Amino acid sequence: MDSESIILAAKQTGAQAVHPGYGFLSENAAFARKVKTNKLVWIGPSPHVIKVMGDKLKAKELAEKSGVPTLPMASDVKDAKNLGYPLLVKAAAGGGGKGMRIVNSPKELKEAIVSAKREALSGFGDDRIFIERYVKKSRHIEIQILGDEYGNIVHLGERECSIQRRHQKIIEESPSPRVDPFLREQMGEAAIKLAKR
């Protein structure tokens, strides 16, 4: 998508605000800054928040500081051995399943790291990785939040994103048939807590 064309179209039509929808522009801090620089209202997270949350290492650190539960992680082979197998090697930048490798035994770890780093560098220009314990039969649940310029934040429930191919979402469902009201509220409150940080 051409961000310049979007800003030009907004100005030509007299739009006062830009909502990026979903996908690449919604996760692009430079585009958010450009919208604001052009005296338009950006409907979405601040450029700073986009940048921090787009970096899984920084996002995880912020979540931990906010008291949001996270999986233990390691940044190198030596520390990864303490997590137990299976492991998941993950790219710190990007998404869409790129730079992720499941590791079932110690002999697979070094090659998985090399491979994940190579894919991450090629796809995102950033070869940083981290390692977590791989949780089998896990659910990929995303909490939707909405906030205003006055600091009010609410959660809108969750999206079930567990139907995947190669760690890429195929379909999303809301509400999740696997999340009960108590868990939904706990996860929503954790998301709000993180957003307020």
Model features per residue range: what roles?
Residues 1-197:
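N-terminal beta-alpha lobe that positions the nucleotide/phosphoryl donor
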